[in-house]
Amino acid sequence: MAIFKDYLENKSPLILHGALGTEMESLGYDISGKLWSAKYLLEKPEVIQKIHETYVAAGSDLITTSSYQATLPGLIDAGLTKEEAEQIIALTVQLAKNARDKVWATLDDSEKANRPYPLISGDVGPYAAYLANGSEYTGDYGQITIKELKEFHRPRIQILLDQGVDLLALETIPNRLEAQALIELLAEEFPEAEAYISFTVQEPGTISDGTSLDEIAQLVGQSDQILALGINCSSPLLYNQALAILKNAGKALITYPNSGEVYDGSTQSWKPKDKDALTLVEHSKDWHTQFGVKILGGCCRTRPNDIKALYAEFRT
């Protein structure tokens, strides 16, 4: 696999997929519970494909599979057999591919010439997503070991790669040990895989578990397989300081913040953003100009129109 590396050498920044769960909610679907939007892989997979299609049409260059919450333990806990759970994870790749190919076939030659053929990124959410206790924002995994984290992540990564994703999206990582486990797992068992890794931050200068961003930059900088590094699922107000540090890893930079609203893990609800807050496009322009950010998108509470606005800014 070397296609992601080739795409990063393009002059224009790459545009990410936006939020999936937010779109499910906007369509009236209840995503509460441990599986979040992944439960609709069981009940309404066609709705997930339709949301992917909306993002492809909006201009996304990286189409992220709906496997963030789809883990073997989580799906088995929901009553599936191991084989059924594996099939559901594989389905996330097929839905993303179907959406990409369906929309791409509708574009005219000038539209295709203005953007690269979208890649499929296999979403590898954190252990925190399985715990479903808000630890994406604390990094508190208790006494878990690096071996246990590798065992947790291995089967999903294997399935995603077997299904032909172009890269892995190791995202919303709140914990240094988990980052180390993922980097080692790729090197030891999936040496041909390409990936990006993205962390959550709650305070300036550290990821969510308190590890310094300097230490994270050093850790990620040692991996030949991690081609991009950044921040997601965090307040955009924390990004400038984080990017100034993470650029020292020598990787392409990636940003996909939340909308500016603040998530309260204790109540599982969102607090409104400041009415004077910058838009996603305004923040992204700043990060691209200041730090050369190569991959731009949005996370929680962002919508297809946000991705469309990024496309309009950076591609037209």
Across the structure, where does each feature detected by a protein language model lie?
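Domain-level signal for soluble alpha/beta catalytic cores
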Residues: 1-316
